[in-house]
């Protein structure tokens, strides 16, 4: 049996960070791929959403080459599934920057607010009622130019409860007179 991704998926994604500057910030989740999960929960297949096709077809934006309207779903799936470590962080940054550019018409699928107080030294934001899929999770307005480390992440949500960490540091404002 196959469980198709729909509103009934009702997944929860909890994003955490140890950086106190994230406290109280808004965090957005942008669905890049929808997901179909096997009945036993062991296999997940992803389908690229129409809104993200232009991102992958633009090699400068995504880093993926050779994507056309006909093959973009398969090429994007293959590309993203192989990303790890620093390459994954760099890709999440590019995707976040693309999503936050209003001209690209990528709407946040969900928005959450990071807790004002730390629990176990972590500040958390929880997204509830998510469809299964692959999400770009980022703090709006933060770009690689004004952060150190990771401020965006790419998360697979293919089960009821998923957790992820954002390991970057938001900048402090240094006012010089």
List each language-model region with its residue ranges:
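Solvent-exposed loop/turn and edge beta-strand elements of beta-rich ligand-binding domains
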Residues: 1-177
């Amino acid at each position: 049996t196959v469980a198709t991704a729909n509103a009934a998926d009702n997944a929860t994604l909890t994003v955490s960070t140890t950086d106190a500057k994230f406290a109280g910030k808004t965090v957005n989740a942008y669905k890049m791929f929808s997901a179909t999960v096997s009945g036993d929960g062991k296999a997940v297949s992803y389908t690229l959403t129409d809104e993200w096709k232009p991102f992958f077809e633009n090699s400068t934006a995504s880093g993926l080459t050779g994507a056309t309207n006909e093959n973009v779903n398969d090429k994007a799936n293959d590309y993203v599934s192989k990303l790890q470590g620093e390459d994954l962080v760099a890709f999440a940054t590019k995707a976040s920057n693309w999503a936050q550019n209003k001209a690209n018409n990528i709407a946040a699928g969900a928005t959450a607010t990071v807790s004002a107080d730390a629990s176990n030294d972590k500040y958390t934001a929880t997204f509830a009622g998510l469809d299964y899929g692959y999400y770009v999770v980022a703090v709006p307005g933060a770009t690689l130019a004004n952060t150190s480390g990771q401020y965006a992440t790419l998360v697979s949500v293919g089960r009821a409860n998923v957790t992820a960490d954002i390991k970057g540091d938001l900048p402090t404002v240094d006012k010089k007179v």
